[in-house]
């Protein structure tokens, strides 16, 4: 998937260490677990986390993608986005998928997160037939809360249990 400034592609083996070093692997106990999950996610689900690459430089600048909702530790809240399906569009997932992203620190505050997340949501809607999304955001992360609101997400009163 391409945007004006970004290439959003599958994560390659050469990307694992850079992703791990930038603390994306927080949901995984080891680098090997991150590698195993990433290698199987596309084949098993048809979606997952993708590498976000700056087109001009070719640099890996973060990750963004869709996952099945999961239990998160810590203090946080679920945010939800429901898009209307286009007329006659088939719905593949009745349950929401979770939107996640992480832009590496040197590339923040340049609009890359919004550009990447909008592309991921577009892919989900038009390629996967997904019209309901959620995001889990830590309560103290007011920047991500405002960002989610910019994307159209609204805080849920009760947490979704996922699948």
Residue ranges, per PLM feature:
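Active-site rim helix/loop that mediates acceptor-substrate recognition in acyltransferases
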Residues: 27-49, 54-55
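Acyl-donor (CoA/ACP) binding surface of acyl/acetyltransferases
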Residues: 1-28, 53-163
């Amino acid at each position: 998937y391409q945007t004006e400034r970004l290439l959003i592609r599958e994560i390659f083996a050469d990307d694992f260490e850079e992703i791990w070093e930038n603390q994306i692997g927080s949901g995984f106990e080891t680098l090997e677990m991150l590698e195993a999950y990433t290698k199987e996610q596309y084949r098993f689900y048809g979606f997952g986390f993708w590498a976000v690459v700056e087109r001009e430089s070719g640099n890996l600048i973060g990750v963004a993608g869709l996952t099945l909702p999961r239990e998160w530790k810590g203090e946080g809240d679920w945010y939800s986005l429901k898009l209307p399906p286009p007329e006659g569009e088939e719905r593949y997932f009745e349950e929401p998928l979770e939107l996640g992203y992480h832009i590496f620190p040197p590339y923040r505050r340049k609009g890359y997160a919004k550009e990447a997340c909008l592309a991921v949501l577009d892919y989900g809607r038009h390629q996967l037939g997904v019209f309901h999304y959620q995001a889990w955001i830590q309560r103290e992360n007011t920047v991500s809360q405002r960002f989610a609101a910019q994307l159209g997400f609204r805080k849920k009163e009760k947490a979704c249990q996922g699948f």
